[in-house]
């Protein structure tokens, strides 16, 4: 006969290596605190509803609290023979209080139990993600305030495009992380639903009180379909999807930190705290931590695709495949929290080379659009103006003369509409500050956006 808690209808024991293959305790032990938390609420409900006696309920709750204390103290050792965290906790409870521990599983299945544990685990940690994002956004605003007027080249196709301010650049990432914050906030809504009470898949005949359990565990709502309750992993997929998008945003900025800290760019320098050296080249200062964040982004994509693939063909309700839903979430939760923390630290110690940033806008022809716009205001059709300025740029490249250093007579030879006032408009600072349209890079705009974004954070 099988020695499993569920082994009544089995006549033989599985080989030890088979038990090892089927066990999940090596990773789902991370949910031990949540399993105990859910079981305490369930035991209280069973006693309240008269499904077990008040004395039995109290004995079970007391035993679970002792196990939790031992867990916190690091005194608990889990056994792979008990398969998963649920069976391990129940086995420990039986050792402490005897056969009455077997009554804890009344009106409950491991199907709704594990779903509850998983919901609780994610629910407990999403606030930490939101807090870490807020800290990152605060650091971005601090840096943007300092550099609201720091002029640099803006890029498209990694080629100089138009001058912008570094503060404007930083606020672009603030907006991205704001969307990330809002996605994780919405993720909380779908995580904050109680599965417990669905039992295996069809509900239970016992007179349970799911509202009581939801209140005890702090859930905002309850699943209204027992099949959905034990089958749903959307909340985990949403977390992984949100995490993948967040990591993509971090990776994009990491790429720029890496590029801009090179000798060729020299726009920024990362602090020694977030750099490493070479074992052979003494001069090296590598942006390893930014590179690691960039590398871990692929890991987050893999986790999302892994769980999507696991879930894609599963018939209702629970299937053992769903045991594979947790490791990715556990890993990516740690990855996200660590990556955001590292990024916040990197930004706080960043040195910005303002003079170098400005210098790259002086001879890169990124003011060409200013000249085309100028001609358009003089009545020249923009397409014609575009062609005229393109010719001037080619001439300037060949003669190594920036537009703002060409003589007025040379400019007028190509476009007689050009007057002396063009030289001010071709200055990087003027070009930046004329971009006053909503969302534009003008310093005045950047400062207004900083104020607006500070209010966004204060409202949290």
Curated annotation (Swiss-Prot):
GO cellular component: cytosol
Reaction catalyzed: 2-(N(omega)-L-arginino)succinate = fumarate + L-arginine
GO biological process: arginine biosynthetic process via ornithine; L-arginine biosynthetic process
Pfam families: ASL_C2, Lyase_1
GO molecular function: argininosuccinate lyase activity
Keywords from the named record: Amino-acid biosynthesis, Arginine biosynthesis, Cytoplasm, Lyase
Protein name: Argininosuccinate lyase
Taxonomy, superkingdom: Bacteria
Chain coiled-coil ranges: none
Top-rank EC class of the record's enzyme: lyase
Entry similarity comment: Belongs to the lyase 1 family. Argininosuccinate lyase subfamily.
EC number: 4.3.2.1
Organism of derivation: Leuconostoc mesenteroides subsp. mesenteroides (strain ATCC 8293 / DSM 20343 / BCRC 11652 / CCM 1803 / JCM 6124 / NCDO 523 / NBRC 100496 / NCIMB 8023 / NCTC 12954 / NRRL B-1118 / 37Y)
Pathway stated in the Swiss-Prot or TrEMBL entry: Amino-acid biosynthesis; L-arginine biosynthesis; L-arginine from L-ornithine and carbamoyl phosphate: step 3/3
Cellular compartment(s): Cytoplasm
């Amino acid at each position: 006969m099988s020695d499993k808690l569920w082994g009544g209808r089995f006549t033989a024991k599985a080989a030890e290596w088979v038990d090892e293959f089927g066990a999940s305790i090596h990773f789902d032990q991370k949910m031990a605190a949540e399993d105990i938390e859910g079981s305490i609420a369930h035991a209280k409900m069973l006693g309240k509803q008269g499904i077990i006696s008040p004395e039995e309920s109290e004995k079970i709750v007391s035993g679970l609290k002792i196990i939790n204390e031992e867990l916190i103290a690091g005194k608990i050792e889990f056994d792979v023979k008990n398969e998963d965290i649920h069976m391990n906790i129940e086995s420990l409870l039986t050792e402490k209080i005897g056969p009455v521990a077997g009554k804890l599983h009344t009106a409950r299945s491991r199907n709704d139990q594990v779903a509850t544990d998983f919901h609780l685990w994610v629910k407990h940690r999403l606030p930490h993600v939101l807090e870490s994002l807020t800290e990152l956004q605060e650091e971005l605003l601090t840096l943007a305030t300092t550099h609201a007027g720091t002029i640099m080249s803006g890029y498209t196709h990694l080629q100089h495009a138009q001058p912008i301010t570094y503060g404007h650049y930083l606020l672009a990432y603030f907006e991205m992380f704001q969307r990330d914050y809002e996605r994780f906030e919405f993720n909380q809504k779908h995580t904050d639903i109680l599965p417990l009470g669905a039992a295996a898949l069809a509900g239970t005949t016992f007179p349970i009180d799911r509202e009581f359990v939801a209140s005890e565990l702090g859930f905002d709502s309850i699943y209204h379909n027992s099949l959905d309750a034990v089958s749903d992993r959307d909340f985990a997929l949403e977390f992984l999807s949100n995490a993948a998008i967040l990591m993509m945003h971090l990776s994009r900025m990491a790429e720029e930190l890496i590029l801009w800290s090179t000798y060729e760019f020299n726009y920024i320098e990362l602090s020694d705290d977030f750099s490493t050296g070479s074992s052979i080249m003494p001069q090296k200062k590598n942006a390893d931590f930014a590179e690691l964040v960039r590398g871990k982004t692929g890991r987050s994509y893999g986790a999302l695709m892994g769980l999507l693939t696991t879930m894609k063909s599963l018939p209702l309700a629970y299937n053992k495949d769903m045991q594979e839903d947790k490791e990715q979430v556990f890993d990516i939760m740690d990855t996200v929290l660590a990556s955001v923390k590292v990024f916040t630290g990197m930004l706080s110690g960043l040195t910005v080379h303002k003079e170098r940033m400005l210098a790259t806008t002086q001879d890169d022809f990124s003011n060409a659009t200013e000249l085309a716009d100028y001609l358009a205001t003089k009545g020249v059709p923009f397409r014609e103006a575009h062609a005229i300025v393109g010719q001037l740029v080619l001439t300037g490249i060949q003669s190594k003369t920036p537009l703002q250093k060409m003589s007025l007579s040379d400019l007028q030879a190509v476009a007689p509409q050009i007057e002396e006032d063009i030289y001010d408009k071709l200055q990087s600072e003027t070009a930046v500050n004329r971009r006053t349209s909503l969302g534009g890079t003008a310093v005045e705009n950047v400062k207004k956006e900083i104020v607006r974004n500070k209010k966004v954070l204060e409202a949290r």
